[in-house]
Amino acid sequence: MNGERAIEMPRTRLREGPIRCCNRSGSTKVKQLTHTLEIRTRGKGLYPFTGEVAKWVASCNVETGLLTIFCQHTSASLVIQENADPDVVLDLADYFERVVPENDPRYRHTTEGDDDMPAHIRASLTATSLTIPVTGRRMALGTWQGIYLFEHRRSPQRRGIVLHLMGE
C-alpha cells in the first residue's frame, strides 16, 4: 500500500423496522408550498434576500421540512455566505472577476454581450439551487449565514427565484 495505512471505519447499526413519518395522530400530513420572488438587481453583485425568505417560511406554518430555493436563470446564481462583514461578498465578487474575466477572445458565445458568457461560467461554478432544513418554522441557517442572489451581468435584471417548502 505504498506506506499508506488502512483506516478502519466505524460500523453503524441500522434501525430495524419501518421508518414512519407521522404526526401525533398517526397520519402523515406533508404540505408542499411554493412562492416566487422577483429580485431586481442593479447589475453585478451579491444581493441578500434572507429576510424575504424567512418571512415566507414563517407564514407557511410548516414546523419541520426542507426548503428548496431555485434561481430561474443561467447568468445568475445563489450562494449562502457570511452576512456579518460586507467585505466577504465584495471579495467573493472580486475573485470571480479575476478567475472568469470578461472580453476573453476564446469565448464563442458573444451574441448577448461580452459579459454573458462569463456570467454563464460563474453561474456554473456556483449554484442555481439551495436546500435548507426548516426546524421550528425557521430556516436552520448558521448564525452568520445569509442567502444571496449572485448577479453576474452588468446591466440591471429582474430575477425569478422559486421557493418550494415541503414538510409538516
Where does each model-flagged region fall?
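N-terminal amphipathic/basic-hydrophobic helices that include classical n-h-c signal peptides
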Residues: 1-28
